[in-house]
Amino acid sequence: VVTEKASDKKTFPYATETLQILSNKKDLRLRFLSASPEQMRRVLQKKIQMDEISFDEVFLKDTTSMVMSGTIRGVLNQVSYKLPVLLQSFLQCIENFSEQEFYHLLFGDDSEDDPIIYTIFESIVQKKISYNSPIFERILESCSIPENAILAIQEMSKKIQQREYKTH
């Protein structure tokens, strides 16, 4: 809810401590991806500041643009929002750190969609499923992802899978 205060936001046990440790590592880029609407940015930044965590980037869903453009389904669909952001972020990593081995760690608070999103993401990154596989397209369709988002996901997946990189 947009009227929430930073102090009202609940934190999962040990999440703050874990993120504080990670945010203090100099060789680590920490990104915060949330399906919360852009209107929550100030509240979330205040909560992040209260928890003494430092993120390199914060991604929030632009629900206003979605509503104004008539893509109401996109407001509710977390996969079509989060998966492209993760893929684009990963592409930036392999472009910036192509000669280095790097690690990525994903954890979330959406017990329904995050496991699906992370499984699809990991399958792409680890090249377990091909970007042009009919199965891959069926998986994306089964997540109710709009056609234009499926094409964008396939294109980013292609770019990722054509690159050489070491990741864990």
Model segments located where?
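Alpha-helical scaffold elements adjacent to nucleotide-binding pockets in ATP/GTP-utilizing enzyme cores
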Residues: 18, 43-47, 85, 113, ...
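Short, surface-exposed basic-aromatic patches at helix termini and helix-loop junctions that form
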Residues: 24, 45-54, 91-98, 119-128
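Hydrophobic alpha-helical scaffolding
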Residues: 34, 76-79, 108
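Von Willebrand factor
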Residues: 71-95, 118
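Conserved Lys-Pro-Asp/Glu-containing loop-to-beta segment of HAD-superfamily phosphomonoesterases
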Residues: 86, 92-111, 115
